[in-house]
Amino acid sequence: MDYIITYLYTHELYIVMKVQAFAAHQPGGKLENFEYELGSLKPDEVEIDVEYCGICHSDLHMLKNDWGFTRYPFVPGHEIIGKVTDIGSAVTHLQLGQYVGLGWRARSCLVCDQCLSGHHNRCLKGQDVIVGRHGGYANKVRCQALWAFPLPKNVNVKSAGPLFCGGITVFNPIIQNNIKSTDHVAVVGIGGLGHMAIKFLDSWGCEVTAISTNPEKEREAQEFGADHFINTKNADALKPYSNRFDMVMVTANVDLNWDSYIKTLRPGGRLHIVGAASEVNAAIFPLISGEKSIGGSPIGGPADILKMLDFCNRHGIEPVIEEFPISDVNEAIAHLAAGKARYRIVLRNDFK
């Protein structure tokens, strides 16, 4: 373990941990070997030795500073799996050596109305793993212990990382919208998010329709649990599905003909967007007359993440992944950026 002993003016000793990582030094730059130091562990924090970390499209956006708040040098990575190696003095629910997962959020205030109502993911004072701090393309990472979630025994350590961002992103709408096993749900986009959404909804007991412009996705969508497949390469493909779905979950990062999807909703149905479309233009009257709604969500709160992990544990749900050593991180990022990932990419720690 690399560390530096620092002598304070108070004549007290403390350990400054040296972290090995991969970082970009400018927007869109290649990731290079990078070292930084961690100070003292806060009482409510844990330190995690990273074993696996997923690559998410949000990492790519942050890498290029698409959202305008990336700080360089930038260490991506927020789908983290590893073992707890240090525990703050106020942490009582985690143990050394325990496998945990860490996603987008690293800290919340615990005292605002959102936190007190269980929506810690909405905390306006919260901190995110890769916003203003270094992420999981590293051998170590720290977070508030609240956001380090123990892995159930049947959850695969190698493939679990994407559950903590992509997984909870598509699981949260099922909880939010009170989806029942008797509901019929459509999933738009059969990619990194969509394939997990289909698996969750199938195990939930729903009738599931997969929607894609790529007819080659039909067989895999059925393997994931879809009951039906709609190829929207044909502009009129949705017309026979008027008033069909209780929820349409949009996982694709594209702008759609929103009115045509709203028509597929049953009265009281919801168009729920988790893909990063640029805007939604839709006629208002069908929403009013059918009491339909449009909404979206990011990740979920701690309670919902724990529910998701328990659900995965009981139903044997895991993302479909491709594994790269972290030393090949730039090749892995290029693979995702080219749209070749099937369906999530996970980096394996091979730091020397």
Where do the language-model regions lie?
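Glycine-rich beta-strand-centered segment in the early N-terminal region that forms part
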Residues: 37-53, 66-113, 152-155
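C-terminal hydrophobic helical "lid"/dimerization subdomain
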Residues: 11, 16-19, 213, 259, ...
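Rossmann-fold NAD(P)-binding glycine/threonine-rich loop
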Residues: 276-290, 303-307
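Helix-to-beta-strand junctions that scaffold the AdoMet/dcAdoMet cofactor pocket
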Residues: 265-266
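N-terminal Rossmann-fold NAD(P) dinucleotide-binding loop
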Residues: 194-195
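Adenosine-nucleotide cofactor-binding segment
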Residues: 184-190, 202-260
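Glycine-centered, small-residue-biased loops immediately flanking beta-strands
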Residues: 269
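NAD(P)H dinucleotide-binding glycine-rich loop of Rossmann-like/cofactor-binding domains
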Residues: 35, 108-188
